Amino acid sequence: MDDNNYQILSQLRENVISKMRIFVDKNNERFFSDNELLQLSDIEVSFLSRNSISRHGLTTNLDKSKKLSPSNCKVKLNKKLFEEKYFLYAEFVLFHEYIHCLGNFSHDKNFRQLENLWPEKKQMNIIGRQLTRELQEIKAQWAWTCSKCGFVVKRSSRKFRSNYFHKECLGKLKNIPIIRPTSLEH
Ligand SMILES: [Zn+2]
Ligand SMILES: [Zn+2]
């Protein structure tokens, strides 16, 4: 990882952890202790590979035979989160992964309650859906469809000109994305 990426990721870590430090319940008790936050700050964070392009973030056990914990996990984030328009959302994704790191494996009620501590959670969901759509577009295959006879050619690139015709019947071809459902967030 080059210096620039390293800086971006450590800044993000710092931002998220300093927000987590101020989350308190109605008795003014903190949700995340200093010790937990210290452990979280030591977790390796890097970028997702192209194979997991449709995910926003992913937490995995380092040792698959042991339970998920701050000392037994690593976090990967989608590189697209570091485009300026997604920067605030990136904090939310890392927060989500940090909740997993603390041993909350599934998205159960307790998990969602912690997740809801994040400010502007609704806005985060909206931006999240926008990112999902963008990632789906990148992954989509394209179908050149003949408007006259219905003939379909699949293409992996969106490169297309509006004046393409089907050789056999001379119908005009249209370019339609084939969108597959993305894997669940985790
Ligand atoms: Zn045709
Ligand atoms: Zn998750």
Descriptions of predicted regions:
Residues 6-84, 88, 105-186:
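Metalloprotease/metallohydrolase-associated module, dominated by Zn2+-dependent proteases
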